Every structure is written in C-alpha cells, then in structure tokens.
Amino acid sequence: MAEEEAGGLVFHPMDQFVIKPLFGEGPVNWYTPTNATLWMALAALAITALLVFGTRGRAIVPNRVQSIAELLYGMVHKMVEDVTGKDGLKYFPYVMTLFCFILFANFLGLLPKSFSPTSHIAVTAVLAVLVFAGVTVLGFVKNGAHFLGLFWVSSAPLALRPVLAVIELISYFVRPVSHSIRLAGNIMAGHAVIKVFAAFAAVAAIAPVSVVAITAMYGLEVLVCLIQAYVFTILTCVYLKDALHPAH
C-alpha cells in the first residue's frame, strides 16, 4: 500500500476485489446485482458473440474472429479427446463452456476499471463444486459400485491398500478445494501486484520503473490468465476420465 498524505489518496491493492452493488449503497444479498454479476454477464456475452459471429460465415479462408473461434474449439476438443478418450467427447460442450467462461472472465479482468470474478473463491468454488458433483454422479451412474475402485489401489501390496484407500478418499474430497483455490489465488495475486506497481507510479522518482514493471506484469498476467483457464479445464478432464474409467 502506498499513501499520498498531501492529497489524501490511499491506494490499496485489495480494493479492486471488493464486491459492490451496481445500484445504491445498500448491503449485498444473493439477489443484488453487483460488479461481479455484471462482469460475469459480459464474459458470457463476449463468448456468445465470438462463437456466433466466428462460426456464422464458415468461410474456407477464415477471418480473424473465425480463426480464434476455431482455435479455441479445436484446442478444447483435442484436450477432451486426449484425456478422456472418445467416450468423453459427449461432455465436450460443458468443458468448452467452462474453459471459455474462465478464459474470458480472466481476460476481461485485465481491463482498466474492470472486475475479475475469478479472483473470488465464491465464484471459483461454485465452478469446482459443479465439476466435483457432476463427475461423482456420473461415476456412479456409469459404473455403479465399481466406481469405488477408484479408491482401491489393486496394484499395491494388500497390507497397504486400506491405508492408500483412505489417502485416495481424502484426496478425492480435497479436489474442489484445490481446484478453486488455485484459480482464485493466482488471479488475485497477479492483479494485486499490478495494483502495487500502479500505486508506485504516483511517485515521480520511480514512475518510469513502475511503468515498465506494470507493462511486464500485464504481459505475464495475460499468460497466467490463459494458463489458469487451461489448468482448470484439463483437471476437469482428468476428473472426468476418473469417472468414466475408475479402475486403478
């Protein structure tokens, strides 16, 4: 945090993560329109616009919008097929939606005066719990009691199998925790560092260095936004594979 006593200005790197109502100053309830819901809606709108306008023409020689849409589609489709196999492709629409939402929410959060929904554990936890609940239900529907074979390491010595089963069970229920914290933590940390460098830009003596640092951090954050969307999605595919093929 940097303070400018004369002007009474206070810069705090965590102020950008405060959820505020869009209208008025009242308390935030579950039904209150907030800056978080606004930017999530904008992310959904941007995804819809890209996929609608990018696939509408279906030109043999694609334009830039169509190229981006086809690149995203092809990358996620290959990811799902490589990790889960052919039988996992029926769940591709959900995985594609998840990847695009996280990616666009991350990128929109880099705009000045914007808000990054994926920096909040409340948002990422909902995404992670939906994945966890979905693959768990799918595992039992597809495999019945055989889904429990995911926790029984048959290749291990018999004496160690009960211990490993407990460890596997604990690690399974920790999945949504690590899945959500990883995304929120990385996005929040990067945005906070950019805010810190921006605060130092107000000090004339170090302003040039601060501007260079902000530029470098923005470049790094673009990469982090892409990587975190990819990591969240590929872990979803791994969990989906466990539900479809639970045997160790």
Curated annotation (Swiss-Prot):
The record's subcellular locations are: Cell inner membrane
Domain of life where this protein originates: Bacteria
Annotated membrane topology: Multi-pass membrane protein
Residues that span the membrane, as ranges: 34-54, 91-111, 121-141, 147-167, 196-216, 220-240
Record key words, sorted: ATP synthesis, Cell inner membrane, Cell membrane, CF(0), Hydrogen ion transport, Ion transport, Membrane, Transmembrane, Transmembrane helix, Transport
Q: Name one GO molecular function term.
A: proton-transporting ATP synthase activity, rotational mechanism
A Pfam family found in this protein is: ATP-synt_A
Name the predominant localization.
membrane
Similarity section: Belongs to the ATPase A chain family.
**How does the annotation summarize its subunit structure?**
F-type ATPases have 2 components, CF(1) - the catalytic core - and CF(0) - the membrane proton channel. CF(1) has five subunits: alpha(3), beta(3), gamma(1), delta(1), epsilon(1). CF(0) has three main subunits: a(1), b(2) and c(9-12). The alpha and beta chains form an alternating ring which encloses part of the gamma chain. CF(1) is attached to CF(0) by a central stalk formed by the gamma and epsilon chains, while a peripheral stalk is formed by the delta and b chains.
- Protein name as catalogued: ATP synthase subunit a
Q: List the source organism.
A: Paracoccus denitrificans (strain Pd 1222)
